[in-house]
């Protein structure tokens, strides 16, 4: 749900994850390949209207359902332990929110005012805000705002890299 903040972000990353499950399911006798292909097809159709500038939005119901579908796919093909690698984008997005919240509350209690690790959480919104905060000086030029479409493409590339790492991990076992 936290990843559904930019046009096409949650659905495009889920296409990568569902495609991975389709490829892996072919080697098993689970019989979920038609379902995984249907999810990929539905998301690709949805992406036509959800990429920047989006005219259709997923909402909480859609994003939470996709999370449940990912979990069910992993359980059916017995690859639950690969979820932290494969779904690393979703994991980092959620961790950024938790880190920001806990750090803000901790610094508010300690210093009387809350401080931030990121300019904004979840992480994808951090790259949309100008200025430097925390580790920002190492990642991005000062006052450099990254366009929404570039952020989504970078997350796609990271998702592809994570899927390849997951396949390599799967083959090493």
Question: How does the language model describe each region?
Answer:
Residues 1-173:
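Alpha-helical transmembrane segments
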